[in-house]
Design a protein with these regions (language model features):
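Acidic/histidine-rich catalytic cores and adjacent linkers
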Residues: 28-221
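Conserved beta-strand -> loop -> alpha-helix junction used to position metal-binding or nucleic-acid-contacting
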Residues: 1-36, 190
Length: 221
């Protein structure tokens, strides 16, 4: 059996790949803007120097205005006061959550993010539909029908990260659908595995496997 947590986690990994891809593009765009701004400032500085050389100032005359200096580059800010790179960086945890858990600032960030990147909105919407399927108290047969409808929606999109996640789910579909038989999860087994790993780390390795298993059964049995 594969529970809903791992399914949603796999889809969120696909969304995370998209976020990182768009972030890298935003970083490249920001660097190009900064370089173009610096180049423009250098050009204006050379023009001012050339003008001062051709029109030397009379020291007896009062300066009419303050001397112009090079301006510092200021990146373009979005409506919430963040740059594109900052918005994409701070969206990591937000995109892994359900929309009903967002606060006001996250809702505003999500609105701007989805306006700037419609593909991420489409991917997040597809993930929310899978969440809704697993939250529904339906039979295994009904879940299979809904899951196949979701496959068709993914087929219609052009998001390669979500399609890769869809293929992974499709390959384990029978195990995924077993979740709807009694809605049980692997939480207990994963908790026990975590405890055993922690216990093994405290021992700094295992010299006698039989004695280690005996101690595990005694402590966690």
């Amino acid at each position: 059996m594969i529970d809903c947590f791992h399914i949603v986690q796999r889809l969120c990994e696909g969304l995370e790949e998209m976020r990182l891809r768009f972030k890298q593009l935003a970083v490249t765009e920001s660097r190009k803007e900064a370089a173009a701004f610096a180049q423009n400032e250098d050009r204006k500085a050379k023009q001012r120097a050339y003008y001062r050389k051709k029109h030397p100032r009379n020291k007896k005359e009062r300066r009419g205005r303050k001397r112009i200096r090079k301006q510092k580059y200021k990146p373009t800010l979005l409506a919430n006061g963040e740059t594109k790179v900052e918005m994409l960086t701070r969206s990591r945890n937000m995109l892994a959550q359900s929309g009903d858990k967002w606060g006001d600032s996250k809702k505003e960030r999500a609105r701007i993010l989805f306006e700037q990147y419609p593909q991420m909105k489409e991917a997040y919407s597809l993930i929310c539909k899978v969440r809704a399927i697993f939250k529904s108290h339906i039979t295994r047969k009904e879940a299979k029908e809904k899951l196949h409808e979701w496959y068709k929606e993914v087929n219609a999109c052009t998001l390669r990260e979500i399609k890769a996640a869809r293929n992974a789910i499709k390959g384990k579909e029978e195990y995924v659908l077993n979740y709807f038989l009694n809605r049980s999860t692997n939480a207990a087994a994963e908790s026990l595995n975590s405890k055993i790993k922690g216990f093994r780390a405290q021992l700094h390795g295992i010299a006698d496997i039989s004695f280690f298993l005996y101690r595990v059964c005694t402590i966690f049995g």
